[in-house]
Amino acid sequence: MSEKFPPLEDQNIDFTPNDKKDDDTDFLKREAEILGDEFKTEQDDILETEASPAKDDDEIRDFEEQFPDINSANGAVSSDQNGSATVSSGNDNGEADDDFSTFEGANQSTESVKEDRSEVVDQWKQRRAVEIHEKDLKDEELKKELQDEAIKHIDDFYDSYNKKKEQQLEDAAKEAEAFLKKRDEFFGQDNTTWDRALQLINQDDADIIGGRDRSKLKEILLRLKGNAKAPGA
């Protein structure tokens, strides 16, 4: 045990008084050198980290160089009386102003493009509405023409039908009148019934009709012709 923890008197240690923080730091370092890693804890790492502020300062300085403060690089942001934010440029060369001018120009260009698109869309809608209105008028005219043409065809059909019907009625009346006249003339002849019967048959081919021999009937009618005293005359 005495070998691991030799008396402090045997060590060449300078106990020159310094501020409390340096004494604590030197004491911890000496203890760490003597004991090594055998009794090292997480608290020792924390104390060592706190005892080396110079390293942390270097890291903070490197971070600030890589990522400078926005307010110090591009200007401070302040609020006016109306509560709107204003940006004051911290660059003497006006580079930040140029960046904001470029941004505002791009924004205005975008708004101009939107206005142009809106105007183009409105013009297209107006043209489309005019085209639809003209198409509706043409369709209405075509519809009216078709209706007039259909009415004309229907009228022509009924006119033609009525004319044909009247003509057929006239022809039928004439045929009936001619038939009645012929009938009256036929029965008004000064002859016998057998004479009129003989007029109704074809004397040239009256011998065979429908495969039957009619020559005997023809011979009888020829004998009764002109005989007013014959039975049934």
From Swiss-Prot:
Residues 56-67 have a biased composition (Acidic residues). The modification Phosphoserine is found at S52. GO terms for cellular component: clathrin coat of coated pit; clathrin coat of trans-Golgi network vesicle; clathrin complex; clathrin vesicle coat; plasma membrane; trans-Golgi network. One of its GO terms (molecular function) is calmodulin binding. It holds the Pfam family Clathrin_lg_ch. It is a peripheral membrane protein. Residues 69-92 have a biased composition (Polar residues). Residues 144-204 are annotated as: Involved in binding clathrin heavy chain. Residues 17-43, 112-124 have a biased composition (Basic and acidic residues). Residues 125-186 form a coiled coil. GO terms for biological process: clathrin coat assembly; clathrin-dependent endocytosis; endocytosis; intracellular protein transport; positive regulation of endocytosis; protein-containing complex assembly. Residues 1-124 are annotated as: Disordered. PROSITE patterns: CLATHRIN_LIGHT_CHN_2. Keywords: Calcium, Calmodulin-binding, Coated pit, Coiled coil, Cytoplasmic vesicle, Membrane, Phosphoprotein. The modification Phosphothreonine is found at T49. InterPro entries: Clathrin_L-chain. It is found in: Cytoplasmic vesicle membrane; Membrane, Coated pit. CLC1 binds calcium, and calmodulin in presence of calcium. Present with 3490 molecules/cell in log phase SD medium. Clathrin coats are formed from molecules containing 3 heavy chains and 3 light chains. Interacts with the auxilin-like clathrin uncoating factor SWA2. Clathrin is the major protein of the polyhedral coat of coated pits and vesicles. In yeast, it is involved in the retention of proteins in an intracellular membrane compartment, presumably the trans-Golgi. The yeast light chain is important for cell growth. The light chain may help to properly orient the assembly/ disassembly of the clathrin coats. Belongs to the clathrin light chain family. This is Clathrin light chain.
